[in-house]
C-alpha cells in the first residue's frame, strides 16, 4: 500500500520492517492543525530566504556543462550562483527542463523506460460522530490498514498487476480528529482513505467506482459509517495531477518503489545520489533516493550534496562524483 511493490516482489517485505521500526521509534506524528501547518513551520525557518509562489519554471539554462540560469514562464531569468535543487520528477527535469544535449545518451535511453508508481485515489470524509468500528481496538488508532486478509491482499495485488478494478479495495485509513483534536469539532471525525488504481487506469469513472467500493468496505467494518457522513470529497488521479505536476497521473511516489528503480537504480541506473550529469544541478524530489513520503530525505540529500561541493574537500568530491557519473551514464 505504501509503495507499489506486490507482496511477492523482491524485498517487498522491507517496507513492513521499516514502518514497524519507525512506529516503535517515533510513532506516526501528524502536524497539529493540518498538513499546511508543516509547510508553515518550514516557511518560518527560512530566515532571509526569498520564496516565490506561482512562478512556473520552464527551462534550466546550461553553459559549459554547468547550470547557470533558471527561466520562468513570465520571462524572468534567475542567475545561478551556487546550485539548483530541482524538486520535480525525473522525467520533468531531464526531458522538459534541460536541453537534450546536456543529458548523456545512456541516461536519455534509460529515462524512456522510467516507470511510474500506481495511481492513487484519496477520499476525504467528514462525519458527525466517531466512527462506529466493529472492532473497538480501532477507535483510538490514528492510522488503520483495512480491507484485506492474507488471501484478500493477494487478490488485490493481482488485480493491480492485471488491470482489474478491485471489488474490495485494500486501503489506508486515517482518523485525523482522533490523532489531532483540532481537525474537527468535539464529537465528530475528520478522516480520509486512500487506495490505488491498477497501473495505467487513471480515468475519473474508475476512480469514482473505487471510491464507492471503498465506502462499502468501510461500511462492512464500521456499520453506520455511511449514515454518519455529512460530506466527502474524492481526489481522483486527475485532481492530484492538476494540483501538483509532480503527481503524474496520480502517482504520489515519484516513480515505482520496486527494486528495479530503487537505491542505485533511482531514477535511472547510476550512483543513487542527488548529483546529476549537469554540474551544480541536484535532484531533490521523490524521484531520487529514497523515494516518496513526508520525510524530506530526498531534499536533504540534495542540499547536503550541494553544500558538499564547497569547502575544503569540495573540489575533490565534485571531481570524483562527476567522473563516476560520466562512467555510468555515457
Question: Where are the predicted features?
Answer:
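Hydrophobic, well-ordered secondary-structure elements that form the walls
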Residues: 85, 125, 193, 214, ...
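Active-site-proximal substrate-binding core of FAD-dependent oxidoreductases
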Residues: 56, 62, 235-238, 308-330
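Conserved FAD/dinucleotide-binding core of flavoprotein oxidoreductases
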Residues: 91-96, 126, 185-217
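A glycine-rich dinucleotide-binding beta-alpha-beta segment and adjacent secondary-structure elements
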Residues: 1-7, 167-172, 224-289
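Active-site/ligand-binding neighborhood in enzyme catalytic cores
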Residues: 1-49, 54-55, 247-256, 260-261
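A conserved FAD-binding loop/helix module that cradles the flavin
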Residues: 284-307
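Flavin-binding catalytic cores
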Residues: 130-131, 152, 162-167, 184, ...
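Mid-domain catalytic core of redox enzymes
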Residues: 58-184
Amino acid at each position: 500500500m505504501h509503495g507499489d511493490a506486490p507482496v511477492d516482489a523482491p524485498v517487498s517485505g522491507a517496507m513492513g520492517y521499516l514502518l514497524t521500526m519507525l512506529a516503535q521509534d517515533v510513532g506516526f506524528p501528524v502536524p497539529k492543525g493540518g498538513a499546511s501547518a508543516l509547510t508553515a513551520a518550514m516557511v518560518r525557518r527560512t530566515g532571509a530566504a526569498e520564496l516565490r509562489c506561482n512562478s512556473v519554471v520552464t527551462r534550466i539554462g546550461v553553459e559549459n556543462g554547468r547550470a547557470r540560469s533558471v527561466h520562468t514562464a513570465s520571462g524572468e531569468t534567475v542567475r545561478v550562483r551556487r546550485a539548483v535543487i530541482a524538486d520535480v520528477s525525473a522525467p520533468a527535469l531531464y526531458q522538459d527542463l534541460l536541453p537534450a544535449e546536456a543529458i548523456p545518451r545512456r541516461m536519455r535511453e534509460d529515462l524512456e523506460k522510467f516507470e511510474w508508481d500506481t495511481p492513487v485515489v484519496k477520499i476525504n470524509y467528514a462525519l458527525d460522530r466517531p466512527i462506529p468500528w466493529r472492532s473497538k481496538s480501532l477507535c483510538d488508532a490514528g492510522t488503520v490498514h483495512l480491507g484485506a486478509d492474507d488471501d484478500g491482499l493477494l487478490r488485490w495485488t493481482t488485480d493491480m498487476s492485471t488491470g482489474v478494478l478491485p471489488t474490495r479495495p485494500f486501503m489506508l485509513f486515517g482518523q485525523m480528529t482522533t490523532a489531532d483534536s483540532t481537525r474537527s469539532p468535539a464529537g465528530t471525525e475528520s478522516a480520509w482513505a486512500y487506495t490505488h488504481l491498477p497501473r495505467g487506469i487513471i480515468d475519473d469513472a474508475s476512480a469514482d467506482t473505487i471510491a464507492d467500493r471503498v465506502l462499502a468496505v468501510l461500511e462492512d467494518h464500521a456499520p453506520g459509517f455511511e449514515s454518519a457522513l455529512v460530506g466527502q470529497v474524492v481526489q481522483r488521479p486527475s485532481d492530484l495531477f492538476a494540483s501538483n505536476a509532480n503527481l503524474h497521473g496520480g502517482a504520489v511516489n515519484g516513480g515505482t518503489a520496486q527494486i528495479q528503480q530503487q537505491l542505485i537504480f533511482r531514477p535511472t541506473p547510476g550512483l543513487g545520489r542527488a548529483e546529476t550529469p549537469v554540474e551544480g544541478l541536484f535532484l531533490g524530489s521523490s524521484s531520487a533516493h529514497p523515494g516518496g513520503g513526508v520525510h524530506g530525505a530526498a531534499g536533504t540529500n540534495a542540499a547536503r550534496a550541494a553544500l558538499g561541493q564547497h569547502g575544503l574537500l569540495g573540489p575533490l568530491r565534485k571531481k570524483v562524483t562527476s567522473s563516476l557519473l560520466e562512467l555510468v551514464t555515457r
